[in-house]
Curated annotation (Swiss-Prot):
Taxon lineage: Bacteria, Pseudomonadati, Thermodesulfobacteriota, Syntrophobacteria, Syntrophobacterales
Function statement: One of the primary rRNA binding proteins, it binds directly to 16S rRNA where it nucleates assembly of the head domain of the 30S subunit. Is located at the subunit interface close to the decoding center, probably blocks exit of the E-site tRNA.
Keywords noted in UniProt: Ribonucleoprotein, Ribosomal protein, RNA-binding, rRNA-binding, tRNA-binding
InterPro entries: Ribosomal_uS7 (IPR000235), Ribosomal_uS7_bac/org-type (IPR005717), Ribosomal_uS7_CS (IPR020606), Ribosomal_uS7_dom (IPR023798), Ribosomal_uS7_dom_sf (IPR036823)
GO cellular component, one term: small ribosomal subunit
Similarity-based family: Belongs to the universal ribosomal protein uS7 family.
GO MF annotation, one: rRNA binding
Annotated organism of origin: Syntrophobacter fumaroxidans (strain DSM 10017 / MPOB)
Name of the protein this chain belongs to: Small ribosomal subunit protein uS7
Superkingdom of origin organism: Bacteria
GO BP term (any one): translation
Subunit structure: Part of the 30S ribosomal subunit. Contacts proteins S9 and S11.
Amino acid sequence: MPRRREVPKRYVLPDPKYNSKLAAKFINNLMRRGKKSLAEHVLYGALDLIEQRSKQDPLDLFHKAMENVRPVVEVKSRRVGGATYQVPVEVRHERRDALAMRWIINYAKQRTEKTMIQRLAGELQDAAQNRGGSVKKREDTHRMAEANKAFAHYRW
């Protein structure tokens, strides 16, 4: 966190195929070692596979999956007088998207399908239908915040 001035926000250009900023950010999150064309291939392949399987607009399903995984509240550790409390705090909009993308990608990697395209397609379809590991992670996060609601007055 800079002390002198606020760092200007970098804006991501929309992706070439769907013209979606969210898809472009997802590609950047999916990318490893600078291999952007490979990350694009994986996401576009997953969205094409979703279109073949469900006969729905894949971008709508992608947005629905993201909406179902975005957390509203999370807990942050706060030390007060020798004790550490898990304090529930509201999640900023940018962080909601970042967490949702991270969770979808991580739980897609843990799936048992053969290729990453199939894993990502499966996780996105599950998330759009409110099931799957990434949705469970969001529910666990919300449950933790609900359980620690008593410490909400320690917010900063």
